[in-house]
Amino acid sequence: MSRKARDPIVLPQGVEVSIQNDEISVKGPKGSLTQVLAKEVEIAVKGNEVFVSPAAHIIDRPGRMQGLYWALIANMVKGVHLGFEKRLEMIGVGFRASVQGSFLDLSIGVSHPTKMPIPTGLEVSVEKNTLISIKGINKQLVGEFAACVRAKRPPEPYKGKGIRYENEYVRRKAGKAAKTGKK
């Protein structure tokens, strides 16, 4: 059983949670999110707190889904209240990014420009041509799109060129040593 899931999720002011059938929906100032619930968990809303507990009819490992749904609901609450943001930085000569309509256009040292469609529900902005900011209310969608952008040109260990998360540490390797010895 998850230790964190024993505590209730406290709802900030302006956030509402409703449960209908097997679906939970969270509404807040930034938008609304829904999640289908598994039969292994029971959700109870009391005042401004949400409680996640294992279902009574589950005999085999009753708390295995409790922590998962606690985290999913907590992320939904945080997303509709504050939102999520991932920032990526591009390091390399000639590396640039720009937003054109619903596409993120990347110039990352290949012969053709790379265009990535921006998923609905995300807001992408580019600062100083090399700093990409991805914002949204769905933590999974923000992280997944940021990972897809990073995967187009991950940082390489010798010169550090590529796309990396802001403040990400890239372990550097020493280059090949010069050949010494007999001529």
UniProtKB/Swiss-Prot annotation:
UniProt xrefs under InterPro entries: Ribosomal_uL6-like (IPR000702), Ribosomal_uL6-like_a/b-dom_sf (IPR036789), Ribosomal_uL6_a/b-dom (IPR020040), Ribosomal_uL6_bac-type (IPR019906), Ribosomal_uL6_CS (IPR002358)
Residues annotated as transmembrane: none
Keywords associated with the record: Ribonucleoprotein, Ribosomal protein, RNA-binding, rRNA-binding
GO molecular function, one term: structural constituent of ribosome
Subunit-level organization: Part of the 50S ribosomal subunit.
Keyword RNA-binding included in the entry's annotation: yes
Top-rank taxon, per record: Bacteria
GO CC annotation: cytosolic large ribosomal subunit
GO biological process, one term: cytoplasmic translation
UniProt similarity note: Belongs to the universal ribosomal protein uL6 family.
Name of the protein in its database record: Large ribosomal subunit protein uL6
Listed PANTHER family: 60S/50S RIBOSOMAL PROTEIN L6/L9 (PTHR11655), LARGE RIBOSOMAL SUBUNIT PROTEIN UL6M (PTHR11655:SF14)
Main function: This protein binds to the 23S rRNA, and is important in its secondary structure. It is located near the subunit interface in the base of the L7/L12 stalk, and near the tRNA binding site of the peptidyltransferase center.
Gene: rplF
Statement: the UniProt record of this protein carries the keyword Ribosomal protein: yes
